[in-house]
Amino acid sequence: MNEYELLDSGHGRKLERFGKVTLDRPCAQAVWNPSHPAVWKQADAFFTRKQGLEWRGRERLPDSWIAEVNGVRMKLSTTDFGHLGVFPETRAMWDWIRESVTQASHARREPLNFLNLFAYSGGATLAAAQGGAHCCHVDASKGMVQWARENAALNNLAEHPIRWIVDDVNKFLTREIKRGRRYDAVLLDPPSFGRGKGGELYKIEHALLETLELVEKVMSDQPAFVYLTSHTPGFTPIVLKNLIQQLLGQGQLDCGEMLLTGSDSTFAVPSGTWARWEVSQKSNRF
């Protein structure tokens, strides 16, 4: 089931429905004209960055609400930065991960070990868990990890084998290497800029290569896939593909844009990039 829909976009804005709530938020890349001007009147609230960060109509919204996005029930809430606790451009990736994990687990006759880095509110973690994977969810924000745990409970996955880790990603990976822990599949969505649990500075242009080198070292000898996403300007699909290919070598490589999508009468909105490495029968990288 899916309760998300992109209703329209244009004039630097996007209009989206999340379950029972419709929101009008900034979207710098939507430089075209709106396709359906009348539908914008449906917005329950409006977020602007023109004079600081401000929600208009926020008082009309519930403090939080539940919406199912591509089979994952998510708790949503308007944050002071205009976020909600889900990035719907990743929902196609959730579907791919759920299906790939299911197929790989059946083929191996054992659960895949799935690692989600910079894991936010856990949509991908829960999609992997729905596919039967044993998961490890890592984020530097204690609040976001707690939010993800609440989402797990909403999906009847509170007792599923998921390790919830609040930590700096690179420090966590270094410790996992020393402990000898290995993972069959890894997803990472590094921020452009962030701080770790202990205040460690993370700038993607300086830190990502180190992160990927550490990821390579925690991969099992029977890897399934590595999935890399980014919302950083300049980190195009080819940039991400080159990074993965250089480190992981032979395998099936794909890349593209993450998109917000609605009906056929609305424009798809580019909202980030992705690259993916999958093991192939000819690959002997590991």
Question: Where do the language-model regions lie?
Answer:
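Conserved SAM-binding loop of SAM-dependent methyltransferases across substrates and taxa
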Residues: 121-135
